[in-house]
């Protein structure tokens, strides 16, 4: 695995620190316009007291040591003790050849030999996906791509909540729509789901069963015929799971394993996990309720698993599910992408799994906060379909897959998000999605022009590439691997978007001021075409992580 220029500089500084018994970590920054050097470090400032030397005096020692590496064209010392370095052109030229030889693998980290299981979306199969699910889907799928790029084995999982009262309510909701579609006066209970999507399913049921169930009664959460209730539950689950899978596929989200809550009950996983807790002396009774000793692993209080009426609390099937998942997947880490309203649930889940003998840190929760749509400066409620939510299918019709994915990935998932619909439909540089895709369109345009003129890009010597923006951009491209590592470690999708914007900002400025195809200087033109190919490749690699497409022309 090749070493980046920043890694090279860091390693050189670290070696000098070890020679001088300096324990401080070198800090490196990229200089704008390469003045007075490509990279700078404050290591001499922050460590001078440790070795009883003045910063400028220490900087001179570092300079002489760096010169011995034969990697630097120039080393400048700036008051009060900064080191500014310019690497040799042949080192810089390796960036382009590395990018174009590795292609889609550029930026890949070494194999970690660790497996991450990531569960995301996991919307109840009770209707269409809404914009909140969309944010969860984007954060989850981008993290999947990041972890793969960072060298992990990655398993993707969707947990289907197909047991519990919400499915009973779904069955009644669909049943009422079925009756209404038969022109039978059927009053919808207040707790039923809203939306015209249930009309579509009702028509499918009528086509198969006609008036067969017209005389059956119902309550708020039950059809008063067990077999019919079970039938409507299963038909509804199957229908909406199919819809959800298609909506995710249309949104460029692929999830391989779909696990079932009902299966946890059917295979007696809850009884099994209770026996495990009992064998580990992790349970006790109080006021006829069964408690789990979660305070042993940092929870603020012990948690009830079985209430005094013998019904289960929410956490018990969740613990059984996760214990089963740990055994089935053999993953080193489970990551769940959950809505922000689950925050108080995290510690008790981690403690519950630790009481089963698992690593307390095996379960990690990534929180995803709410999304609010903004149009004309105020909150926007889409009204195309009945219901209280903003449906994913509707917003995709308005803004498209790429725009929505990019914007949802561009902000920290821990923060509430205002999604400006006016901004992401603009066709100018103020729209970050347009700005990013326009860069790929410009790259393709340049390469197409060169192809028409029969000018072939060169990848070898790039010593002639000495424009400050070329050098700055080469360094940014070279840093892609570091961005991947930091983004994966921090679970930070927005860092990839920030990186894309940084490339595009420098590139658009470069494009505006430089004549890239100059038939009077073919050697430089060919080198610049190789440079453009490298820029395009890194953008495409970053786009792939976000799950959006490069654009050929705009």
From Swiss-Prot:
SUPFAM superfamilies from the UniProt entry: Anticodon-binding domain of a subclass of class I aminoacyl-tRNA synthetases, Arginyl-tRNA synthetase (ArgRS), N-terminal 'additional' domain, Nucleotidylyl transferase
Pfam families: Arg_tRNA_synt_N, DALR_1, tRNA-synt_1d
GO molecular function, one term: ATP binding
Enzyme class: ligase
GO CC term, one of those recorded: cytoplasm
Enzyme nomenclature, EC number: 6.1.1.19
Annotated localization: Cytoplasm
UniProt cross-references to Gene3D superfamilies, sorted A to Z: Arginyl tRNA synthetase N-terminal domain, HUPs, Isoleucyl-tRNA Synthetase, Domain 1
PROSITE patterns: AA_TRNA_LIGASE_I
Family matches, as InterPro entries: aa-tRNA-synth_I_CS, Arg-tRNA-ligase, Arg-tRNA-synth_N, Arg-tRNA-synth_N_sf, ArgRS_core, DALR_anticod-bd, Rossmann-like_a/b/a_fold, tRNAsynth_Ia_anticodon-bd
Chain location of the short sequence motif 'HIGH' region per the record: 123-133
UniProt entry keywords in alphabetical sequence: Aminoacyl-tRNA synthetase, ATP-binding, Cytoplasm, Ligase, Nucleotide-binding, Protein biosynthesis
Reaction catalysis annotation: tRNA(Arg) + L-arginine + ATP = L-arginyl-tRNA(Arg) + AMP + diphosphate
GO biological-process terms attached to the record: arginyl-tRNA aminoacylation
NCBIfam families reported in the protein's UniProt record: argS
Protein family per UniProt: Belongs to the class-I aminoacyl-tRNA synthetase family.
Subunit structure: Monomer.
Protein's name according to its UniProt entry: Arginine--tRNA ligase
């Amino acid at each position: 695995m090749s070493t980046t220029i920043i890694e090279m500089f860091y390693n050189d500084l670290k070696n000098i620190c070890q020679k001088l018994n300096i324990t401080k970590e070198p800090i490196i920054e990229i200089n704008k316009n390469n003045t007075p050097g490509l990279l700078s470090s404050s290591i001499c400032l922050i460590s001078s007291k440790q070795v009883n030397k003045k910063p400028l005096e220490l900087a001179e020692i570092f300079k002489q040591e760096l010169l011995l590496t034969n990697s630097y064209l120039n080393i400048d010392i700036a008051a009060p003790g900064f080191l500014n370095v310019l690497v040799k052109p042949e080192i810089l030229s390796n960036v382009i050849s590395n990018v174009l030889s590795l292609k889609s693998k550029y930026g890949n980290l070494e194999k970690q030999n660790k497996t991450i299981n990531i569960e995301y979306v996991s919307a109840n199969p009770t209707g269409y996906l809404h914009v909140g699910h969309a944010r969860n889907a984007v954060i989850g799928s981008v993290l999947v791509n990041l972890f793969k790029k960072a060298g992990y084995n990655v398993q993707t999982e969707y947990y289907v909540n197909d047991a519990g009262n919400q499915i009973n309510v779904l069955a009644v909701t669909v049943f009422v729509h079925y009756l209404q579609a038969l022109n039978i006066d059927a009053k919808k209970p207040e707790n039923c789901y809203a939306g015209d999507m249930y009309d579509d399913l009702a028509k499918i049921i009528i086509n198969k069963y006609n008036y067969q169930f017209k005389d059956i009664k119902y309550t708020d959460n039950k059809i008063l015929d067990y077999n019919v209730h079970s039938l409507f539950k299963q038909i509804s689950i199957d229908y909406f799971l199919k819809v959800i899978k298609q909506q995710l596929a249309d949104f460029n989200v692929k999830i391989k394993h779909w696990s079932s809550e009902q299966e946890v009950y059917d295979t007696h996983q809850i009884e099994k996990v209770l026996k495990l807790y009992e064998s580990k002396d992790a349970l006790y009774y109080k006021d006829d309720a069964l408690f789990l000793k979660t305070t042993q692993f940092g929870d603020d209080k012990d948690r009830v698993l079985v209430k005094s009426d013998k019904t289960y609390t929410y956490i018990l099937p969740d613990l059984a599910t996760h214990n089963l998942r740990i055994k089935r997947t053999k993953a080193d880490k489970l990551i769940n992408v959950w809505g922000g309203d689950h925050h108080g649930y995290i510690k008790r889940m981690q403690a519950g799994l630790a009481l089963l003998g698992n690593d307390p840190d095996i379960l990690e929760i990534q929180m995803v906060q709410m999304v609010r749509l903004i149009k004309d400066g105020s909150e926007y409620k889409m009204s195309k379909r009945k219901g209280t939510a903003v449906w994913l299918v509707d917003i995709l019709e308005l803004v498209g897959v790429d725009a929505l994915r990019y914007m949802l990935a561009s902000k920290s998932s821990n923060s509430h998000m205002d999604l400006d619909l006016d901004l992401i439909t603009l066709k100018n540089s103020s729209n970050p999605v347009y700005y990013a895709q326009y860069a790929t369109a410009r790259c393709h345009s340049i390469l197409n022009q060169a192809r028409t003129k029969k000018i072939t890009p060169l990848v070898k010597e790039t010593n002639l590439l000495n424009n400050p923006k070329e050098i700055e951009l080469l360094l940014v491209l070279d840093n892609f691997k570091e961005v991947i590592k930091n983004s994966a470690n921090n679970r930070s999708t927005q860092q990839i978007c920030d990186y894309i914007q940084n490339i595009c900002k420098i590139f658009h400025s470069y494009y505006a001021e430089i004549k890239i195809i100059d038939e009077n200087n073919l050697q430089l033109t060919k080198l610049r075409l190789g440079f453009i190919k490298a820029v395009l490749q890194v953008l495409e690699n970053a786009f792939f992580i976000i799950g959006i497409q490069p654009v050929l022309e705009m």
